[in-house]
Amino acid sequence: MGNLVDNKFTWVIQNFSSSQSRVVPSNQFVIGGCKWRLLVYPEGFNKSGDHLSLFLEVADPRSLPPGWSRHARYLLTIVNQHSDKISKRNEATKWFNQKIPGWGLSAMIPLTKLHAKDGGFLVNDELKIVAEVNVLEVIGKLDVPEESEEETQVTQPMKKVKVDYDHVESNDLMINETPPVSELMDVNGFQVLPSQVDFVKRIFEKHPDIAKDFRPKNPHLRKACMNFLLSLMETLCQPPQKLSNEDLVEADNALTYVKVSGFKVDWLEKKLEEVKKKKEEEQTGEARIQELEEELKEFKQKCLDREAMLEKEKAKVLTARAPLTLDDVI
């Protein structure tokens, strides 16, 4: 069953355990004028057999015109029907494009936890998934005019399908509505949103040669490249503890993309290496903290054990020191 309300798509997969398919796609749904679909890999995207994989994908990306790109924030949830507190969630803000039309997690939930008896994720052999999508920006035309979007509901039992989704990447993504042209502003030949103007101006003031060798002339491609640059810088401003290793791999890819486009970003490459080092130090420090906490826990337990032994010995000494009474002697 699929139900779309207020940018939230709810998908209930029936007869989940009987699936023989490598990938199970949801029906298409429209949010922000863009067509989407969910992809579930019951035994994992890489056929690992130990985790379920879940992705959000732009529906039928091959039908879209060259240069299309969509920026969106999404939240994917595998619902625990006994307690929402232990539902599994994946939230991210990403760019969807021809190269990467889908984002999500290859290790969304361990299969042992998913199939656990009375675990709450599979109830009556039904798996409930909720996708919330907020489209931030669209480069290229919308799939569907937003006024034509309607609430849809479809019953979808598990069935075997043959679909080639090998191009789906194991990450996450986001999207946005296309602003009217009048809302875009020009900064050094790049069309940006009003909210981005001051930041982009600061970039050009501090790095005036950044676009000296920039090659693309198409305004949509120029805008896409600038958005990749801004997204990369936004990532680098995140606290290390909030960045995953996948985020850093994605940042590396974004850096390569903007460099190939002609942006001079040597300074940004150094910052990325600095963030990587901070992340490594954070992970190493976190591991050391856990190790020390375990050692301290063991030490405290030993202290408690020693204190208990000490009290026992004191009790024995007191007993030994007690004099015999007259009754004991007689």
UniProtKB/Swiss-Prot annotation:
Residues 6-133 form the MATH domain. Gene3D superfamilies: Apoptosis, Tumor Necrosis Factor Receptor Associated Protein 2, Chain A. It holds the Pfam family MATH_2. It comes from the Eukaryota. Residues 263-314 form a coiled coil. PANTHER family: TRAF-LIKE SUPERFAMILY PROTEIN. This is MATH domain and coiled-coil domain-containing protein At3g58210. It comes from Arabidopsis thaliana.
